[in-house]
């Protein structure tokens, strides 16, 4: 790559000349950084039956800290904490779930990767983010139906949710919310023991004041 400099003469004449690289030094920032991350994790829950979507009682908490002591430039630091709480619903196999998360980044210009869950349907850019997610989950049917040797349909579930989020950046603070419904099914493919959850989520979010729809996909890899 060649560097050029622009010179302006008195008579509004402009000309461009090539720069001799021997007299200039160009420093490009590294695209890869070495980070150190520390964390704590705690979980406690009741044993689940095959028909339950979530544990009747459960608590999961995590917290962490990330910084860059090995870099020659100061990338700042990040800390976060979040937790899940599960409670019994109004009837058998129903479940109420609560989630709360908070993260803070010291550098207001450069963001680390996100560590907490956003409100559904919303993206929260900023150096300080808070999130609250609530959901009520219920099974609709238990078909236990093998559709072929490749697919086994286990359960069909539904959920309603309401989420809230707050984001602070260099321009100020903003809060948003979303609400909607989810429809999912728990399946097994190729006779594998690991359950796969497929579904769709639709709702309304106040960030852009419009409806949204997401696909849901998760794999249970518990040992």
Residue ranges, per PLM feature:
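Outer-membrane beta-barrel "beta-signal"
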Residues: 37-40, 132-134, 181-183, 211-223
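Outer-membrane beta-barrel transmembrane domain signature
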Residues: 93, 136, 155-189, 198
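Extracellular/periplasmic, surface-exposed regions of secreted and cell-surface proteins
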Residues: 5-7, 159, 206-210
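C-terminal outer-membrane beta-barrel translocator/porin domains of Gram-negative envelope proteins
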Residues: 10, 18-156, 160, 168-169
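Outer-membrane beta-barrel channel domains
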Residues: 1-14
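Outer-membrane beta-barrel and related beta-rich outer-membrane complex signature
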Residues: 6, 110, 170-172, 212
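Predominantly the C-terminal beta-signal and adjacent terminal strand-loop region
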Residues: 94, 98-108, 188-223
């Amino acid at each position: 790559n060649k560097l050029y400099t622009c010179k302006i003469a008195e008579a509004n004449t402009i000309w461009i000349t090539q720069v001799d690289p021997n007299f200039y030094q160009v420093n490009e920032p590294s695209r890869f950084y070495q980070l150190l991350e520390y964390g704590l994790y705690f979980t406690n829950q009741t044993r689940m039956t095959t028909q339950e979507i979530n544990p009747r009682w459960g608590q999961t908490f995590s917290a962490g800290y990330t910084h860059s002591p090995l870099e020659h430039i100061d990338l700042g630091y990040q800390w976060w904490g979040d937790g899940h709480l599960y409670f019994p619903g109004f009837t058998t196999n129903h479940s109420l779930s609560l989630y709360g998360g908070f993260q803070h980044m010291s550098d207001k210009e450069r963001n680390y990767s996100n560590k907490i869950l956003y409100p559904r349907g919303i993206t929260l850019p900023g150096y300080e983010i808070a999130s609250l997610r609530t959901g009520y989950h219920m099974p609709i049917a238990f078909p236990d139906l093998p559709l072929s040797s490749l697919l086994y349909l286990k359960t069909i579930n539904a959920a309603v949710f309401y989420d809230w989020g707050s984001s602070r950046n260099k321009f100020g603070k903003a809060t948003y919310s979303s609400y909607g419904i989810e429809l999912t099914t728990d399946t097994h493919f190729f006779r594998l023991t690991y359950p796969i959850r497929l579904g769709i989520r639709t709702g309304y979010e106040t960030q852009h004041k419009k409806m949204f729809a997401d696909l849901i996909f998760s794999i249970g890899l518990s040992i």
